[in-house]
């Protein structure tokens, strides 16, 4: 079984061939389009149509292209959440920054960080590197 990526709401498959496909838009802007993300954790290459340019430093709203649900986390500001199922059938929450150019990814199973990558981790470690009972105060 190959690694799969799913919408956190409808559980529809987001990985097509070699990319994770999401819809992206900017708040208060008509600019929107599809973005193809590399599914390898730690690889931050993206592809968009030439008419839809992602601007570094700006925050985007990410939606499932199937059910159109917003994938940006309501719990962790500036992070986006999707689900990953590995080749053994284990399920993980994948969090990545919704701010273009920020490079950080968290792979979490239950309350345990299984993997974290990227030079911008220090911005978001506050959400994950504290005891569970204290997270409610964030």
What do the predicted segments below correspond to?
Residues 22-32, 79-91:
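Short cysteine/histidine-rich metal-coordination sites, predominantly Zn2+-binding motifs
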Residues 45-56:
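Short, intrinsically disordered, charge-biased short linear motifs at domain edges
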